[in-house]
């Protein structure tokens, strides 16, 4: 119905096969963080509102916004996609199950709470991913213990 229902934030730190891309960015995150960044959600929402207003269309579906910070820490949107990020399962492991949310919405599940919810993650939560294996969710402080 054109309303934001769910949101979450994550950070890509390192990338799978980063040496094959001139920029070092492949889009497939090998090491990332689950974040609590309501300001980024507000910026993404503002950008989406502007885009939909400019195209005279109604918001519908799943969207992701990618940001990159400048040297002063100011975030800028680099792209907006109409799909989930590759590390969506890492979000689910952290409690933000967007796939389940979408199924509930599409099936008009009467028990689904359509009130806006920004998923909140335990601070310091990271994920590790590689090709053909399930991601690992852990505390960043535990990474040095391995």
Regions found by a protein language model. Name each.
Residues 19-25, 52-58, 108-120:
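Intrinsically disordered, low-complexity coil segments
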Residues 28, 59, 63, 67, ...:
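A sequence-level detector of short, solvent-exposed, charge-rich linear segments
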Residues 1-12, 60-68, 141-146:
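Phosphate-binding glycine-rich loops and adjacent basic patches that engage nucleotide phosphates
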Residues 61-62, 83-92, 97, 120, ...:
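Residue-level preference for alpha-helix termini and adjacent loops
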